[in-house]
Amino acid sequence: MGNNGAAFKAWLDAYGQAWENRNPEAATALFIENGTYQVTPFLEPMCGRKAIFEYWSEVARTEENIQFGYEILVANAELSIARWSASFVIVLPGLQTQLDGIFLISLDDAGRCKSLQEWWHKQEK
């Protein structure tokens, strides 16, 4: 498949569905076995599906009413970039949250993520 615009769009669509449906299994399946996921540049990347599953299991427990959107900025074989946004309610204390960020993603030939780095800003109400 390689990473082109269509492959990257399919990956982002699946990522959004996994998040909106609060499905850690689906989110984890988007990554290769030893994939990395760096939530912010200040944290060490999570390495491997087990760590990614644990992260997304926590997301599924603590967020609801999730909406995800994106705009592809660059998609090529080495690295793809998207601007993304999400809104959700943090279950306790019921805090409405909006995120706006950038993904840097490297996909393998099967369209699974080898590495994901995020930069984002948060607004809470």
Describe the role of every protein-language-model region:
Residues 1-33:
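Short, low-complexity N-terminal intrinsically disordered segments enriched in polar/charged residues
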Residues 23, 35, 64-67:
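Secondary-structure boundary/capping signal
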Residues 34-35, 96:
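Short hydrophobic/aromatic segments of transmembrane alpha-helices and their interfaces
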Residues 36-47, 58-60, 119:
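A short gly/proline-enriched turn/hairpin at secondary-structure junctions
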Residues 16, 41, 72-74:
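Structured beta->alpha junctions
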Residues 2-7, 53-125:
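A beta-strand edge to alpha-helix "cap/lid" segment located at domain peripheries
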